[in-house]
Amino acid sequence: MYEKGFTIEVTSRYEGWWRYNAALMCGCFDAAGRRIGFASSASTVADVGSNLAERPADIAADRTAALQTMPCDHLVLYLYIIPHTLPADNEIDATRPFGIEVRISYARRRLRTEKREINQWSGASVEMRVDSKK
């Protein structure tokens, strides 16, 4: 798609990663702060409330949610991790937060990698501003 814009990738090694949908949305801005574009992408496994018993066969355990943008000075990214199937166990020890990794590149140059902890019950909403030059 755009080789000179931003690429955002979200992954997790958590075995229950399949229980979550991931949505990425961002506004792309020029150096003066004017929005010049918008991009969105989703990795949807199931409808919210599906309460699946196991990972669907057509969903890779190590799936990646990815978003590519047009070239721009900076973006404001919104990342949503949304549970569609809640944990089967109510014990706190069995439902500790799990990790995701967010990798952000611009024109194929890695800008940053962030690790985030996600609550198994509520998921997460993350907002990030990312400059193309940092």
Task: Report each predicted region and the residues it spans.
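Short coil-to-beta strand junction motifs in C2/discoidin
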Residues: 21-23, 92-101
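Short, surface-exposed binding/anchoring microloops in extracellular/periplasmic proteins
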Residues: 1-36
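Extracellular or exported targeting regions of proteins
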Residues: 80-85, 97, 113-115
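Short, solvent-exposed aromatic-acidic interface loops
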Residues: 114-126
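Short acidic/polar inter-strand loop motif in beta-rich domains
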Residues: 15-17, 84-92
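Exposed aromatic-hydrophobic patches
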Residues: 62-69, 123-133
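Short, intrinsically disordered low-complexity segments
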Residues: 33-87
